[in-house]
Regions:
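Basic, glycine-enriched DNA-binding surface that flanks or lies within the catalytic cores of DNA
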Residues: 6-117, 141
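TOPRIM fold recognition
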Residues: 33, 137-214
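Short "repeat-start/strand-capping" segments in structured domains, especially the N-termini
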Residues: 120-121, 199
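Short hydrophobic beta-strand that contains or immediately precedes a catalytic carboxylate
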Residues: 124-127
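Conserved Rossmann-like nucleotide-cofactor binding loop
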Residues: 131
């Protein structure tokens, strides 16, 4: 029997299809982030100015709903993915959570919603975009030279990618394979002294899964 080379499955490129359905005023998103999540206008405006926060209408079958979009953007400015947060509670559509929480199809699994303060020299990782925004709200007066990154879950690959990119001016993920990016953090730990105690902070929930992840 001849050995066959099995090619890795290539993921379809991400396409941001919500652009025509965005709401420039961000009114419903702003109300949700203020009333339900306790964020201030100042913080919301800061993230809106960053260009990666938006409000849009999502259609699923005959159901239309307003959503907040958290865009993952590469250093080249291209959108690599996005996560969606429902604004209006609907226990019929979402019996478990009450609101939509979803990563858009074909999003880059090693990317996440991020925000830079100054010129990043360290990284702070979060489970969700709104956790990231809440952290910024609490710490914004003292934050400097840091990149905040949402993993949309607990993903070592995201930590690996953003750490390697921080140490290479963003070049690592552009020049290396998916597998190499996944292994970058372990490789850096084994072969260099670049991973210092103050380089990476993991700011996640104090639950069993998160503690196991850390």
């Amino acid at each position: 029997v001849e050995n066959e080379m099995i090619e890795p499955v290539k993921q379809e490129p991400f396409s941001y299809v919500l652009q025509p359905y965005e709401h420039p005023d961000f009114e419903l998103g702003r109300n949700y982030l203020k009333e339900e999540r306790g964020l201030t206008d100042d913080t919301i405006n800061t993230f809106l100015a960053g260009g990666n926060l938006a409000e849009a209408t999502r259609k699923k079958g005959d159901y239309f709903e307003p959503i907040i979009v958290f865009k993952y953007r590469g250093l080249d400015g291209k959108i690599q993915g996005a996560s969606l947060q429902g604004i209006v509670e609907n226990k019929v559509q979402y019996p478990k959570r009450g609101r939509l929480k979803q990563i858009m199809n074909h999003s880059d699994g090693l990317a996440g919603f991020s925000f830079d303060v100054g010129t990043p020299k360290r990284l702070v990782f979060f489970e969700a975009p709104i956790d990231l925004m809440s952290y910024y709200e609490l710490k914004k007066d003292t934050l400097q030279d840091v990149r905040l990154v949402s993993m949309d879950g607990l993903k070592k690959g995201v930590i690996s990618r953003y750490t390697a990119d921080l140490l290479t001016d963003g070049k690592f993920s552009q020049a290396n394979s998916y597998t190499s990016i996944l292994k970058a953090l372990d490789s850096l730990n084994k072969t260099t002294k670049l991973i210092t105690d103050d380089l990476i902070t993991i700011a996640v929930d104090n639950d069993k899964e998160a503690l196991k992840f850390i």
